[in-house]
Amino acid sequence: MKKTVKALAAYQAELPVETVKAKYGLQHLARLSANESVYGPSPKVAQAVRAVSDDILGYYPDGQATELREAVAKLNHVDPQHLVFGAGADELIELLTRVVLEPGSNIIIPNPTFGEYAMHAQIEQSTTKKIPVNVDNGNVDFDAILDAIDDKTAMVWIANPNNPTGVFETTSSIKRFLDKLPANITLVVDEAYYDFVDEPDATVAPLVAEYTNLVVLRTLSKAYGLANLRVGYGIMQDPLYSAMQAVRLPYNLSTYQIAGGTAAVLDQEYLQKNVQRFQVERQKFQDFLTKNKFKFYESQANFIWIKVGETKKVGQKLLEQGFQVNDRLNPEWIRIALGTPEDNAELKLAFLKATNK
């Protein structure tokens, strides 16, 4: 077994809602720890999945996810042959790391950010350089990343909006960074939460046509509400496209995933309705935090990163009141996803109580 794998700890997933409710004697639990959509997917998703014929169960699915590929390409105005599909963006993170990294190479990431980037680098026997975000506003320090590059640097990862901070980097700032980044270094912009952004030019996807070292990742797990179905995609040019197609499993999406994912992508009216709900609730909750003098980073995602002091104590107090949040990422900061308007209203009261305000 690889020494780098021996050093890893298994991911601690959220317990089932009913298990947590039973443990704490709760009538209602708002699960706000995994950045899921409380509104779920378009009703057309279930219709599409149910419409899949039982006759296909004995046959492998479409290995190119043709129907989904065409829908995603049209939505994003990209070449269908620039799309690689995976079981969520997680699979694509794993594959990109496998394709790009050699033992002894390194990646550069902001700190904090999504933990899987560093984990997969470790598996591939690469090291990770962590560059602190701006302490005042959470923005990525692109100049410090450029200064950290050496002859072993192979990848830079930018989650945009960032997870767990929710902070958004403009397309112009990323383009300036790309223009300074050596062409042999792959920049991956993980846009898992880009659907929630209410700023113009929310995506760098159009830049893929200009830069062969740029990859954009997307998922249907968040705004589209398909976390259980596991569908993600990457936008990239050759040679990365061909390499990713070569290493991915040949039938990595089932017919159910393809059908459900396609239905979700085609129902943009449902998506936008729910995104607007999240944007309204996000602003209301950030106004509440400002009014009560909490430090937080301005979010463009469906969650907020808040400084609370003793994170574990606050998280436990919230859980006892029926709100499951993510208190595992930082000893002083907590990440709370937005729930329904009703849950968010109750959460404000619970949050004041949990933080002794």
Swiss-Prot record:
Subunit composition and interactions: Homodimer.
CDD domains: AAT_like (cd00609)
Protein's pathway: Amino-acid biosynthesis; L-histidine biosynthesis; L-histidine from 5-phospho-alpha-D-ribose 1-diphosphate: step 7/9
Main enzyme class: transferase
Catalytic reactions on record: L-histidinol phosphate + 2-oxoglutarate = 3-(imidazol-4-yl)-2-oxopropyl phosphate + L-glutamate
Cofactor(s), by name: pyridoxal 5'-phosphate
InterPro entries: Aminotransferase_I/II_large (IPR004839), HisP_aminotrans (IPR005861), HistidinolP_aminotransfase (IPR050106), PyrdxlP-dep_Trfase (IPR015424), PyrdxlP-dep_Trfase_major (IPR015421), PyrdxlP-dep_Trfase_small (IPR015422)
Entry-annotated residues carrying N6-(pyridoxal phosphate)lysine: 222
Keywords per UniProt: Amino-acid biosynthesis, Aminotransferase, Histidine biosynthesis, Pyridoxal phosphate, Transferase
Family matches, as SUPFAM superfamilies: PLP-dependent transferases
Family: Belongs to the class-II pyridoxal-phosphate-dependent aminotransferase family. Histidinol-phosphate aminotransferase subfamily.
Enzyme Commission designation: 2.6.1.9
One GO molecular-function entry: histidinol-phosphate transaminase activity
Pfam families registered for this protein in UniProt: Aminotran_1_2
Keyword Nucleotide-binding: no
GO biological process, one term: L-histidine biosynthetic process
The protein's name: Histidinol-phosphate aminotransferase
